[in-house]
């Protein structure tokens, strides 16, 4: 499993790829509050690369994610 964290405006976004399932995931935590699953097994959106890209864009963090990760997501490759 790969797992990365990005912080923006008091929110911590965790994203990555779970090789066991296999699918992408993303969640967000706001300073001390519960974690909200955005993409993945326990989220409203399944763990497809399209859903992960949609969540990244919706939350305005595309500029914080390494280009290598974005390229792999767009090509639907694990990273």
Walk through the language-model features, giving the residues of each:
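Mixed-charge, Lys/Arg-enriched low-complexity segments
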Residues: 33-79
């Amino acid at each position: 499993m790969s797992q990365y964290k990005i912080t923006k405006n008091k929110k911590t976004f965790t994203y990555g790829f779970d090789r066991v399932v296999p699918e992408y995931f993303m969640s967000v935590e706001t300073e001390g509050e519960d974690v909200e699953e955005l993409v993945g097994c326990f989220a409203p959106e399944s763990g497809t690369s399209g859903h992960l890209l949609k969540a990244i864009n919706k939350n305005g963090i595309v500029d914080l994610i390494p280009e290598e990760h974005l390229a792999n997501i767009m090509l639907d490759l694990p990273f």
